[in-house]
C-alpha cells in the first residue's frame, strides 16, 4: 500500500519536498462535462447568451484555474506551466439534453506533475458554463471529472481505460 506523502511524522499536513526530483516534461489531460437543455445548447452554439460568449469565457476561466491551482488546492506546488488548452465537443445523441464534453491539457517542464492543474481547469470550465447559463435553467448537470492521461515523472505514464 502506498503511503500518504502529504502527512509528516506527527500526522500533520505538509507539502512534499520535490527538491531531489528530476526535471522532466509532464503533461496531463482531464475531462469534465455539463449537460444542458435545448435552449442553452442553442444559446451556446449560436453565441446568443446575454452574458457573452460562453465558450470563450469558459476557456479563459479554465486557463486561469490551471494557473491558480496552487492557491486553492493546499498541497499543490506553484508550477511554471508551459501550456494550457481547453477543447469542447458536443454530444447530441440524447436530445433534448445536450452534453458538452470538456477536455483540458496542461504541460510543464518541472519536478512534479500537472494532474491537479488539468482537473482544476476542467472543473472551473464546467462551473463557468453553469454560471453563465444558470439564468436559463438551474437544472444543468456537471458530469464526472477525471484524469484521462498523464505522462512524465517517476510514476510513469497513465492512460485511463474505458472500463475505469
UniProtKB/Swiss-Prot annotation:
It catalyses: (8S)-3',8-cyclo-7,8-dihydroguanosine 5'-triphosphate = cyclic pyranopterin phosphate + diphosphate. Gene3D superfamilies: Molybdopterin cofactor biosynthesis C (MoaC) domain. GO terms for biological process: Mo-molybdopterin cofactor biosynthetic process. The active site is at 131. It is an enzyme of class 4 (lyase). Keywords: Lyase, Molybdenum cofactor biosynthesis. GO terms for molecular function: cyclic pyranopterin monophosphate synthase activity. Its EC number is 4.6.1.17. Substrate binds at residues 75-77, 116-117. It holds the Pfam family MoaC. CDD domains: MoaC_PE. Belongs to the MoaC family. This is Cyclic pyranopterin monophosphate synthase. It comes from Staphylococcus aureus (strain MSSA476). The gene is moaC.
